[in-house]
Amino acid sequence: DRKAPKQLAQEIVDKLEVVTPGVETPVSRLSGGNVQKILVGREIASNPNVLMVAYPVRGLDINSSYTIYNLLNDQKKKGVAVICVGEDLDVLLELCDRILVLNGGRVSGIVDARSTTKEKLGLLMTGSGEEKQANE
């Protein structure tokens, strides 16, 4: 079911509470936070099986951040694999089920987000933590 581009744009604007004079306003005239919301909404609108987002709430106020959190969590509930790249541990712990930590270009651990702490992640990030395997 393909929607008309204008209708789809309006749905994204409404759902993500994008502050804009109208859907025909060029993205270049929007604030950074509103551009971020449009980018996430556009990707979700394509109904992907896998969704990769990098720094999905960077530059957003707390209300907009929670709008994005809820949207990404809804995608996970629909069975979409959501891969999130980031460095803000609070965001990663909020959005992720599992966290893969890199140090020096190598995997230093894969941990369950619900049972880890920022301190443990920090140790893995610096190479000081105990290596965790993917099957744990």
What role is predicted for each listed range?
Residues 1-136:
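Glycine-rich phosphate-binding loops of nucleotide-dependent enzymes
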